Amino acid sequence: MYNGVIKTGQQVMIVRRDGEKIKSKVQQVQLFEGLGRVNVEDARAGDIVALVGLESVDIGDSICDPINPQPLEATEIEPPTLTMMFSVNDSPFCGREGKYVTSRNIRDRLFKELESNVALKIEETTDKDAIKVSGRGLLHLGILIENMRREGYELSISKPHVIMHKDKETGGVLEPIEYLVVDVPEKNMGGVMELVGNRKGELVRMDNRAGQVHLEFTIPARCLIGLRTRMLTATQGTAVMHHNFHEYAPARGEVPGRANGVMVSMSGGAVNAYALNNLQERGVMFVAPTDPVYEGQIVAENSRDSDMVVNPTTAKKLSNMRTTGSDENIILKPPRKMTLEQALEYIEEDELVEVTPQSIRLRKTKLTESERKKAGKKAVVEMVEV
């Protein structure tokens, strides 16, 4: 409490950040003592209290006297900079590993999160199985997704997009710019400069403090996706980075996306070592022998820039009598295992990240090859019409 006295049963005025005033009544005043709370009749300035009975109270609102309301200065909450679609997991493996799989389960959990996560924004969409979620960056939304999967939720996540604004004066496109601060040993500074420079970052300040370099950049929010993991790899885990919202500024241009295509499974079943032995020469595998896969799942990165439809479940043919019983030595490279952040950075517009309590899989939005071809033709027609 900042000022005054509040009592059980007292009428109060809730003043919102936008100036809206709502009358309410305090049902109970609870005073914090140690790790617990005790019911009290009244509380005074300086006390840390919990008020029971107030509805629709948000962080930044002031609870005032209804006769002479004097609200405190509202805490400014940084606007969301990143958005992605949370949708129902409609893959063939739906319901195998998770407990909460329906759109209602996901929607209820997200709206419950709004009560405590003030930087989160949720919007309904025309698709009843999808909901648009905006937050303060990939780390902010990644923590939410990780918490949900640990609670037993299954969901599909789309490629993250930054929230662009339109300049009212010039009509140009403005994008969120973050202020990035990095502390790194001098010997590893080159890797940081290269990483940030390739992602449209601009150096603002640099200090050398006894072999430890302090770097400050401005960088587009979209270019921060996956930067932390790559920076730790480039600096052997010695870099410490922090960023916060800086401003909206003119867009700094396109950043090169994924250079390679992917290998997409054409059938479902268990991955076979014989098939992987033939495929690993053409790319980097994401799955290991005996892993279950389904049609439309991304199983590897192609060495070329185009997508390839493959069958990772193919077994060795038993038609040749001389080679059927031969013991062939198959040596497979370890598959690449992605974290949630790496997976969200990796996918393209026509792909999704399937998140379950036990697995993180990459998949195409359209699971069958025929559906993907139809979607591609439709996109070409729409582009010509525009």
Give the positions of each predicted feature.
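Acidic, low-complexity intrinsically disordered tails
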Residues: 361, 366-386
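Short amphipathic alpha-helix segments
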Residues: 100-114, 184-199, 203
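Residue-level signature of catalytic and energy-coupling elements of molecular machines
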Residues: 9, 46, 60, 86, ...
